[in-house]
Regions:
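Cytochrome P450
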Residues: 1-414
Length: 414
C-alpha cells in the first residue's frame, strides 16, 4: 500500500469515471480525504469492511446539526449538496426521530406489499416496451432506453404510490435531476430546491382536499391526527426523499444492468439459458456498478478512528458504494469482473450498495423487484438488444452521487 502523504481527492462535480478513481484511492487506503464542491473538506469511506463498520457505527449521526462547516456558516445557500444535508426526513434523522419517520412509510415497502405491486409493475413494463419499440421505429431503429423505459417505470410506480397525478411527473423528474446534480450553478440549485418543494406542497394540499388510497394521503392523516407524529416540514421532506430515491436508484440500476449485459454477452447468454437468474443480474449489477457512487452525508459525533484513519468530529462523510462494490479485499482479485454467477457462490460477500444498518434502503425490495421484472421482460422480448454507440461514448450523469449515464441509445435487434 502507498504510504506517501495523501493529497485530498477533489471530487469531479460532473461525475467523471468513478471506478478508475476508486481503484486508485483504494490502493492507498480504505478511506480518502476529499474536497467537495465549494472547497468543503470531507471524507469518503471506500473499503467494504470499513464502510460496513461506519454505516452501523453508534457514534455516527445523520442530522446536519453535527456538520461543523454548516454550523459555522462555511456552507453557502447555493451549495449543490445542501438538500442532502438539510432536508427534513428520515435520511437526516437519528434515533427516535428516525424510527418515527421511517415507521410512517415502512408499511408501503414490506415484502408482502411489494409483491402486491408486481402485477402493476408488469403491466407498466409491457406498456413501456411498446413505447420503446415505437420510439425505435420512429428514429431509424435506435431509441434512448433510459428515457423511454428505465426512467418512466420507477417514476410511474412511485408517483402512483404517492398519488401524484401524471401531469406533474415530467416536472418532478426534471427538478429531481437538478437536485441530485453536483455540477449545478448555485442559483440554479436554490431554484430547483425551491420549485421542488413548491410542487410537492401543492400536491400535498390537493391530496388533503381529496384524500385517496395513497401514501401522501396516509402521511397527511398522520400529520393531522397527531401533530407530534409528523410536521409539515417533515411531510414535504419525506415526499422529496420518496420522489428522488424512489426513482433515481432504480433508474440507474436498470440502466447500468443493460449496459453491463450488452458489454458482456456471455453473461447475458448465461441468464437467457437459465444458467443464472435475473435476481442474480440485479445483485451483481448493484455490486459491480452501484446506482449510487458517493452518498451524502454522515457525521462522526466525536473524532473517530476507522481502518487506521482519523475522521475529525463533524466531518461530512460520503458512503462510497461504488468503490466498496469493487473492493478486492472483500470481493476477491476478480472484483472488477462482471459475473452473474457470483451472487450464488458459496461464501460470496454481500454488497453494501443499498446501505447497511438502521438506514438500510427502505425501498430496496421494490427496486429489486422493478429491476428484475424490467430486465427479464426487456431481454426476453429483445434478446439481441445492444448499445447503439460504444460504451466509451456514453456521456456520464452530471453527478458524483448518482452513478450512470445521461442517455442510453440502443438498437433493439432483429
Amino acid at each position: 500500500m502507498d504510504t506517501s502523504p495523501v493529497t485530498p481527492h477533489r471530487l469531479d462535480p460532473s461525475g467523471g469515471c468513478p471506478h478508475a478513481d476508486n481503484a486508485r484511492l483504494l490502493a492507498r487506503a480504505a478511506l480518502a480525504p476529499v474536497v467537495l464542491p465549494g472547497d468543503v473538506e470531507g471524507m469518503a469511506v471506500l473499503g467494504h469492511d470499513a464502510l460496513r463498520e461506519f454505516l452501523a457505527h453508534p457514534e455516527v449521526a445523520k442530522n446536519a446539526r453535527h456538520f461543523t462547516a454548516l454550523r459555522e456558516g462555511r456552507v453557502t445557500a447555493g451549495w449543490p449538496l445542501l438538500t442532502f444535508a438539510t432536508v427534513h426526513g428520515m435520511t437526516t434523522a437519528d434515533g427516535e426521530d428516525h424510527r418515527r419517520l421511517r415507521s410512517l412509510v415502512s408499511r408501503a415497502f414490506t415484502a408482502r406489499r411489494v409483491e402486491e405491486l408486481r402485477p402493476r409493475v408488469e403491466e407498466l413494463t409491457a406498456s413501456l416496451l411498446e413505447d420503446l419499440e415505437r420510439a425505435a421505429e420512429a428514429d431509424g431503429g435506435v431509441a434512448d432506453l433510459r428515457r423511454h423505459f428505465a426512467l418512466p417505470l420507477p417514476m410511474g410506480v412511485i408517483c402512483e404510490l404517492l398519488g401524484v397525478d401524471p401531469e406533474y411527473r415530467e416536472r418532478l423528474r426534471r427538478l429531481s435531476s437538478q437536485v441530485v446534480a453536483t455540477d449545478i450553478a448555485p442559483q440554479d440549485a436554490v431554484a430547483a430546491n425551491r420549485d421542488l418543494v413548491a410542487v410537492l406542497a401543492g400536491i400535498a394540499a390537493a391530496r388533503a382536499e381529496r384524500p385517496g388510497e395513497d401514501l401522501t394521503s396516509a402521511l397527511i392523516a398522520a400529520r393531522d391526527e397527531a401533530g407530534d407524529r409528523l410536521s409539515q416540514e417533515e411531510l414535504i421532506g419525506t415526499l422529496v426523499l420518496m420522489i428522488i430515491a424512489g426513482h433515481e436508484t432504480t433508474l440507474n440500476l436498470i440502466t447500468n444492468a443493460v449496459r453491463a449485459l450488452c458489454g458482456h454477452r456471455d453473461q447475458l447468454d448465461l441468464v437467457l439459458g437459465a444458467g443464472a437468474s435475473w435476481a442474480d443480474v440485479v445483485e451483481e449489477t448493484l455490486r459491480w456498478d452501484a446506482p449510487v457512487s458517493y452518498f451524502p452525508f454522515r457525521y462522526p459525533v466525536r473524532d473517530l478512528t476507522l481502518a487506521g484513519t482519523v475522521i475529525p468530529r463533524g466531518t461530512p462523510v460520503l458512503a462510497g458504494y461504488s468503490a466498496a462494490g469493487r473492493d478486492p479485499a472483500a470481493h476477491g482479485p476478480d472484483a472488477d469482473r462482471f459475473d452473474v454467477t457470483r451472487p450464488a457462490r458459496e461464501g460470496a460477500v454481500r454488497h453494501l450498495s443499498l446501505g447497511h444498518g438502521v438506514h438500510y434502503c427502505l425501498g430496496a425490495p421494490l427496486a429489486r423487484m422493478e429491476a428484475g421484472v424490467a430486465l427479464e421482460r426487456l431481454f426476453t422480448r429483445f434478446p439481441r438488444l445492444d448499445l447503439a454507440v460504444p460504451e466509451g461514448e456514453l456521456v456520464r450523469e452530471s453527478s458524483f452521487v448518482g452513478n450512470s449515464v445521461r442517455t442510453l441509445p440502443v438498437c433493439l435487434g432483429d
